[in-house]
Amino acid sequence: MKLVLASNNRGKLAELQAMLAPLGVQLIPQAELGVGEAEEPFHTFVENALAKARFASAHTGLPALADDAGLCVQAFGGQPGVQTAYYATQFGYDKGDANNVRALLEQMQGIDDRRAAMVSTLVAVRSPQDPEPLIAVGRVAGEIARAPRGTGGFGFDPVMVLPAFGKTFAELPPEVKNAHSHRGRSSRQMLELMREHWFAGTSER
């Protein structure tokens, strides 16, 4: 089954393709089909993910999967939230993972409450008008490190510490990260939702 991924983020593509492999799903980045980025005007992950999935499906005629994910910092009242990808631009930096990490650490200087959560909301639709979108939410709580650690992953992985391991996501092997990450959790939920709603009574492939 071909499924359009409403994202051009290579990190997301690799993680989601690996986690949905048991279904025989082939994820195709929307850019490969000539689809641009959808607007994300909403204040919640689920609304933005649904908008992106519908947009990708409408422009390709294929089922679509969208992921809206972000970092929610306790000391910032849950921000940057849906603005996570553009966090650095608020402080005069160009958009990008390294600048996001730099800006976050600068803004958290002198803050002792390092609690934060990474949230991934996956939405899948069979068509733009699908009345029953599949929605899966994964959340993992941790703490923001005081300096980047590790070389793996992407986004805020170098500063998101998982207390159970005492390591950042970027310090963990990919298979360990995927087993415990927010996207890993939402992907496992989505896998079961697709099996139940889309592939029930079929051989899945």
From Swiss-Prot:
Species this protein is from: Acidovorax ebreus (strain TPSY) (Diaphorobacter sp. (strain TPSY))
EC identifiers of the protein: 3.6.1.66
Signal peptide span: none
Disulfide bonding pattern of the chain: none
Pfam families, per the entry: Ham1p_like (PF01725)
Cofactor(s) of this protein: Mg(2+)
GO CC term, one of those recorded: cytosol
Binding site for Mg(2+): 39, 68
Family: Belongs to the HAM1 NTPase family.
Biological classification of the source: Bacteria, Pseudomonadati, Pseudomonadota, Betaproteobacteria, Burkholderiales
Protein name: dITP/XTP pyrophosphatase
Active site: 68
Reaction catalysis annotation: XTP + H2O = XMP + diphosphate + H(+); dITP + H2O = dIMP + diphosphate + H(+); ITP + H2O = IMP + diphosphate + H(+)
Cofactor comment: Binds 1 Mg(2+) ion per subunit.
InterPro entries: dITP/XTP_pyrophosphatase (IPR020922), ITPase-like_fam (IPR029001), RdgB/HAM1 (IPR002637)
Residue numbers binding substrate: 7-12, 69, 154-157, 177, 182-183
Main function: Pyrophosphatase that catalyzes the hydrolysis of nucleoside triphosphates to their monophosphate derivatives, with a high preference for the non-canonical purine nucleotides XTP (xanthosine triphosphate), dITP (deoxyinosine triphosphate) and ITP. Seems to function as a house-cleaning enzyme that removes non-canonical purine nucleotides from the nucleotide pool, thus preventing their incorporation into DNA/RNA and avoiding chromosomal lesions.
GO BP, one annotated term: purine nucleoside triphosphate catabolic process
Quaternary organization: Homodimer.
GO molecular function: dITP diphosphatase activity; ITP diphosphatase activity; metal ion binding; nucleotide binding; ribonucleoside triphosphate phosphatase activity; XTP diphosphatase activity
Alphabetical UniProt keywords: Hydrolase, Magnesium, Metal-binding, Nucleotide metabolism, Nucleotide-binding
